[in-house]
């Protein structure tokens, strides 16, 4: 049985809980063994993956960054996304990126699937991507 670690940056907990719910539901339907670790913010996701890289077959990174008035948004997004990509390539492990980057709270809620008018859920999409890679494209999802 494949083992996946979900790392949830819970700074915007009301948004990310919907991502966690969608990704765990999808993984359980696929009979994937899951563990979840909560971290304070998106910037802490890469180190959490690195510390656990030998224990799991794949990872799902979940979080939310909402643009403010300073360059902080760009710095956090760029450094975190680059670190996650480098970990995936270096250790040959799939990492589904379900980190929402939004210009405002409404966009973040839409991308988390929390608004009934929108069926997009980045947690679901990240889980689907990781499982697709783990199954090596042999099964249709």
Model-derived regions, located:
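Glycine-rich phosphate-binding loop
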Residues: 47-84
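Short, acidic/small-residue loops that bind anionic groups at enzyme active sites
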Residues: 74-102, 120-121
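Short, ordered loop/turn segments at secondary-structure junctions
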Residues: 10-11, 39, 64-65, 100-104
């Amino acid at each position: 049985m494949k083992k996946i670690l979900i790392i949830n940056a819970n700074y915007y907990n009301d948004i990310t809980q919907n991502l966690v719910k969608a990704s765990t539901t999808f993984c359980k339907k696929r009979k994937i063994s899951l563990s979840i670790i909560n971290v304070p913010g998106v910037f802490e996701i890469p180190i959490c993956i690195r510390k656990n890289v030998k224990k799991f077959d794949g990872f799902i990174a979940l979080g939310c960054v909402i643009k403010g008035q300073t360059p902080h948004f760009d710095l956090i997004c760029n450094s975190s996304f680059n670190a996650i990509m480098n970990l995936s390539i270096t250790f040959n492990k799939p990492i589904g990126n379900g980190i929402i980057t939004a210009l405002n709270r409404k966009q973040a809620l839409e991308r988390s699937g929390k608004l009934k008018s929108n069926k997009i859920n980045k947690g679901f999409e990240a889980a689907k991507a990781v499982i697709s890679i783990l199954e090596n494209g042999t099964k249709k999802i």
